[in-house]
Amino acid sequence: MSIEIIISLGIYFIAMLLIGWYAFKKTTDINDYMLGGRGLGPFVTALSAGAADMSGWMLMGVPGAMFATGLSTLWLALGLTIGAYSNYLLLAPRLRAYTEAADDAITIPDFFDKRFQHSSSLLKIVSALIIMIFFTLYTSSGMVSGGRLFESAFGADYKLGLFLTTAVVVLYTLFGGFLAVSLTDFVQGAIMFAALVLVPIVAFTHVGGVAPTFHEIDAVNPHLLDIFKGASVISIISYLAWGLGYYGQPHIIVRFMAIKDIKDLKPARRIGMSWMIITVLGSVLTGLIGVAYAHKFGVAVKDPEMIFIIFSKILFHPLITGFLLSAILAAIMSSISSQLLVTASAVTEDLYRSFFRRKASDKELVMIGRLSVLVIAVIAVLLSLNPNSTILDLVGYAWAGFGSAFGPAILLSLYWKRMNEWGALAAMIVGAATVLIWITTGLAKSTGVYEIIPGFILSMIAGIIVSMITKRPAKASYRLFGVMEKLLKRKK
């Protein structure tokens, strides 16, 4: 690793730690630590939600898929873009209004508890446990990505990369809480944006423009330029269904709960979707132009997911290379920090305060939150020590698991007055169980149907049927629904 790359990465790591220190000085109570005091503006909300969402797949996974399979990968990008937009449009305003009306709910399990008027502690326990289990695995996957990045891009030891990435993320998350996570995600989102604009443009000019690029791709495999080639109706529907997962991702939708004002959601949506469309387009073009570049200049690409890293090393000065590689770290670290904090909030707010210390002071809760971040990080690191550990295979299904378990339950809670706690509990259990059964029985592979499709549909049906056959929600729950709708109309 050259000294220039070390300097670039050093500047990046120091900047993240300084932001954590700034947030630490601003954090005084549990609301600050978990939701930043509900003071996020539209720019920070939009970019932090995007950065928390995208992880390393944006700079490695999507370019790699485009390089290997061509334009058929666009169906996945389209599904995710539509899902993100509908999340801003359908879920964000009502969730922000409801959490404010519901005595400032600060976590998803806390929202469910207050939405249904503390009617069943089981609902809070189940939702908190789902978050803890899936996100601990999810976090370990991000840590593995960090270790592998150092190993493949810098020739460094896997464990060194793992520990370095984890140490920086844990420090700023542990001390700065939600504000640190959101501000670092904002900066990391900006870095990702710049990298995914710069790399494909420079690579494109090296290939020679539009005609030479298409000529080189056609020479490799003309089917790479056919969006329908190799994509059956089932696979297209499955790709598009990825968008359903957005409704149930706690680390993304918590940003909507933390925004300063409901009115800020509209500009946040415009900023967030502009960011996403440009970065997804840059990611797609990086992979596609990579095919042309590799063929024209005889570059050997053993692993398609390395194409962004290859471009970063070949086309740029080492100082810029360090900056571009820090964009991958930014994508990885932004997701790890968000997942760590959401998991810690489930431990602190939804288990510790709810069942052990109802009258705990803010100082005590912040301390428990910080300890939770540390403990969860240690567990995730232990799972990550072996990058080929089979337990990490489950992480790829977490998106479908969260989307199916929480998505229908949250949407029904926000739009249907008759929804009760037993319906929400049934939706969570059926959604999560369907995804697990679909995967473990081999139905996902044999049918080609992405597990979120049966999971989401059956979860929605279970939520409606169980709510209808069990007792109506308390009158206070109906009143709260009315307060939410009035607040929503007043703030629009």
Swiss-Prot record:
Disruption phenotype: Disruption of the gene eliminates the osmotically stimulated proline transport activity and practically abolishes the ability to use proline as an osmoprotectant. It is a multi-pass membrane protein. Its main location: membrane. Pfam families: SSF. Induction: Induced under high-osmolarity growth conditions. Has two osmoregulated and tightly spaced promoters. The first promoter is sigma A-dependent and the second promoter is controlled by the general stress transcription factor sigma B. One of its GO terms (cellular component) is plasma membrane. This is Osmoregulated proline transporter OpuE.
